Amino acid sequence: MIPPSFEYLTPSNISDAVALLQKHGDEAKILAGGHSLIPAMRLRLAEPGYLIDISGIGGLDYIQEESGQLRIGAMTCEAALEESEIVRSIYPLLLDTAKMIADPSVRNMATVGGNLAHGDPANDHPATMLALRASVVAEGPNGTREIKIDDFFPDFFTTALAEDEILTEIRIPSPPSASGGAYLKIERKVGDYAAAAVACQLNIDSSGSIENIGLGLTNVGSTPIRASSAEELLKGKKPDENMLAEAGRLAAADSEPMEDLRGSAEYKRALVNELTQRAIKLSLQRAEGSR
């Protein structure tokens, strides 16, 4: 299907892009890599009258550690995450996630910021950022503000960004020693949206007990979901098989899947149960290996 006509705008900096958003309001959409927005436009799920392309704006594609956090520019492509030595050595959850997005040609174009700003619960990074307890930086006419990721997805295909704000950066707390993470996903074919997926990030103490844990669920609700019941169960514990099974059950209970072409709600809850247990086990193994 061909999208309806629109006016294509190419601002030279963020301030100009914000001014265009102010001018055109809800008729405008930001275009970054286009991996999420363009397919939605072709299906006429999004019909902007104005498309504001920020891909030519410099200074928004970086990955750097600074002041106890990993800072990722919103225009950083998925392939850059795969290639980053910082990500490969310290953030296995991010690496797992980037590798599972579509195919290499798409990952060379699709951006981390776009994956979040589209507000799609089927996208992979929202759950990953929940597990990592990230925050995002938004820039608008009144300056910049930082938004916790738990507050960023209030509803289906909706974000906390104002109409005249642009997501410019993602900030992730640097993990302590003995940390590990994993992203596990079931899809009908490679590169497809998940039937269900689970992101886990944790760190352990000297005895192997979990000090802190984050669990995010992909595509099993109208928004990305934090499996808070399972997090609360596991914090401060050294889980055995029975506790892992209970964590899986609790995560499945926190999910809110709907039946679609990827499976029934019951099937998706079963996936969440199993993937949660596997993601925690793999994260624990990686945490032990990072001591």
Where is each model-derived feature located?
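C-terminal structural segment of proteins
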Residues: 1-291
